[in-house]
Every structure is written in structure tokens, then in C-alpha cells.
Amino acid sequence: MKEKDLKLIQGDSFYLTLNKLDKEGNEIGFVEGEEIVFSAKKNLKQPEYDIYSDKMTLTEEGKIILYLSPVDTNIKLGTYYYDIQYKTLNKDIYTLVKGELEVVWEVTDE
């Protein structure tokens, strides 16, 4: 599991491409039926998510593109805690990455 902080603009679309690697660091690709979930909370103890998305696209190369819509990212400015979880075909769950998510302001509101 890796730690990485992210920054996104409030109310904007956000895409993140994920690669699947084996233990030696070689890219092996995701397969149909595997799942990725992005979730974020302002407070780790709160029961509800501020962002929750399982919207993803599997590319021909075996990469997953995770998508957060403008509705997903239209939350209060500030720092949140996030993680990205991976669910295997066997329903095992692994946290791939976690960190702080900073939601920053925007000027144009469309």
C-alpha cells in the first residue's frame, strides 16, 4: 500500500489512471470483473462518505481509469482523507493507495 496526497478542484471532473503490478513491479493489467472504489471523508470517524465512486473504465491495455464527476467533487473546500480499494475476482479487498485529498477553490462556476 502506498501513501500519496492528491489535490483536486471543487466541482471539476477528475480522472486517475491505475496500473496493476505484480510483486516484481511488472505491469500485469486488470481484468473484467475486478473493481476499484474511491472514497473520501472529512473525518475518519464519520459514517457517511463525502465522496464515493466506483465509476471506472477498463482500457484495452488492462488499465483502469477511475472517474469522479463534478457532482462527486462539489464538496466543501478543505482537506479530506481518501483511499482507493481494489476488489479481486475472488472478492478479496486491498487498499492500493491512501492519503490526504485537498479540495481547492475554483473561479469559474459552470
Regions found by a protein language model. Give the residues of each.
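Contiguous segments within soluble domain cores/interaction surfaces
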Residues: 1-110
